[in-house]
């Protein structure tokens, strides 16, 4: 349904769109007569300046607003609906347990063409129950620090095959309680 909505917007000469949809998806389960019903939040977007990282940023903002502190994006190459080099699977943690929360990325050009969509369509499909289960909206009071924060920009060179999630985890582990924020970018 999301691809159809994006296609309609594109065909009406709307230069960019950012849409969301909340719907039920029925997934067949081997050995069961009835399928598994899941509520899915779908985000879809296209337009100038919109790319995978823009979509990922929207998902990260959602996770932050829901109080989900630990999430991981891993490359996904097996889903034929998505472009294999521009897709990630999202995992979230609750009580130390990693849960598959969904997928996000660029729709495969062949799928976009079949649906009469512009070439670069970005979609995220997130399991609502998993998001809610991992969320924590409790606000905690934090005392102001005795000393002002120090911001450091570090430039490091890493192997092209290194995963951002692994780098973030290593930096956060070594930074410990004194590290407040890590932001990675590529040049």
What do these predicted regions represent?
Residues 19-20, 29-31, 36-42, 49-187:
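A carboxyl-terminal module marker
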Residues 1-30, 38-39:
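Polar, glycine-rich mid-to-C-terminal structural blocks
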């Amino acid at each position: 349904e999301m691809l159809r909505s994006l296609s309609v917007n594109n065909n009406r000469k709307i230069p960019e769109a950012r849409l969301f949809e909340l719907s039920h998806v029925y997934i067949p389960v081997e050995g069961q007569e009835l399928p598994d019903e899941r509520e899915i939040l779908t985000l879809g977007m296209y337009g100038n300046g919109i790319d995978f990282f823009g979509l990922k940023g929207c998902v990260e903002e959602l996770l932050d607003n829901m109080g989900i502190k630990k999430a991981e994006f891993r490359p996904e190459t097996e889903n034929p609906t998505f472009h294999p080099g521009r897709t990630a699977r999202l995992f979230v943690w609750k009580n130390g347990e990693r849960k598959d929360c969904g997928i996000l990325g660029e729709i495969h050009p062949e799928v976009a063409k079949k649906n009469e969509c512009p070439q670069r369509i970005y979609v995220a499909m997130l399991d609502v129950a998993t998001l809610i289960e991992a969320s924590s909206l409790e606000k905690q009071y934090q005392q102001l620090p005795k000393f002002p924060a120090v911001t450091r920009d570090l430039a490091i060179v890493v192997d092209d095959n290194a995963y951002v999630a692994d780098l973030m985890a290593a930096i956060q582990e070594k930074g410990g309680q004194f590290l407040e924020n890590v932001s990675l970018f590529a040049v």
